[in-house]
Regions:
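Beta1/beta-strand and adjacent pyrophosphate-binding region of the FAD-binding site
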Residues: 1-15
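Glycine-rich flavin
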Residues: 2-5, 22-28, 32-161
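Short glycine/serine/threonine-rich phosphate/pyrophosphate-binding segments
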Residues: 15-22
C-alpha cells in the first residue's frame, strides 16, 4: 500500500498541475499521477498542451512569424538582408528549450509546494483509492480523501452518416 494523501490528481496537464499546486498551497498533502516519462523514467509534467500541443506549435509559429516579418517588412525600416534562410534544426531546438523551461517550471513548483509526483497510469480503483500501474507492471494503491481526475481527452472518430 502506498502513501495516504489528502488529494491525488490524476493527470498533470494544465488543469491537473494547477489543481495539485493549489491543493498543496491550501495545506493538503498532494500527489499528482502522470503517465508520460522521459528517458530517465522521470515524470514529464504539463500534459499534451505543454509537451506536444499548444506550446510547441506556438513556439514554431512564433519563429515562422519572425521569418515572415524579416522577409516582408524589415526593408521598410531600412534593413536589408542579402540572404534569409530558415534553420529548421535551430527552430526545433528553440521549441524544445521553451517546452523544457516550462516543464521544469512545473517541476520546480511541485517541489516548492511539496507535491509528490507519481509515475504511472492512475485509475480510481475504489472509494478514496487510486491504483497506479507503474512501468514495472505492478499496481500500487494510494489512499486519498479527495481525487481529481484531470486526464484530458482524446478525439473520437465520428462514423459517416
Amino acid at each position: 500500500m502506498g502513501k495516504e494523501y489528502d488529494v491525488i490528481v490524476i493527470g498533470s496537464g494544465p488543469a491537473g498541475y494547477v489543481s495539485a499546486i493549489r491543493s498543496a498551497q491550501l495545506g493538503l498533502t498532494t500527489a499528482c499521477v502522470e503517465k508520460w516519462v522521459d528517458e530517465k523514467r522521470n515524470s514529464i509534467l504539463g500534459g499534451t498542451c505543454l509537451n506536444v500541443g499548444c506550446i510547441p506549435s506556438k513556439a514554431l509559429l512564433d519563429s515562422s512569424q519572425k521569418f515572415l516579418e524579416a522577409q516582408e517588412s524589415l526593408h521598410m525600416h531600412g534593413i536589408k538582408m542579402s540572404e534569409l534562410a530558415i534553420d529548421l534544426p535551430m527552430m526545433m531546438s528553440r521549441k524544445d528549450n521553451v517546452v523544457k523551461q516550462l516543464t521544469q517550471g512545473i517541476k520546480g513548483l511541485f517541489a516548492a509546494n511539496k507535491v509528490d509526483s507519481i509515475v504511472g497510469i492512475g485509475r480510481i480503483s475504489a472509494k478514496n483509492e487510486v491504483s497506479v500501474l507503474g512501468e514495472n507492471g505492478k499496481n500500487e494503491k494510494y489512499q486519498a480523501k479527495n481525487i481529481i481526475v484531470a486526464t484530458g481527452s482524446v478525439p473520437i472518430d465520428i462514423p459517416p452518416v
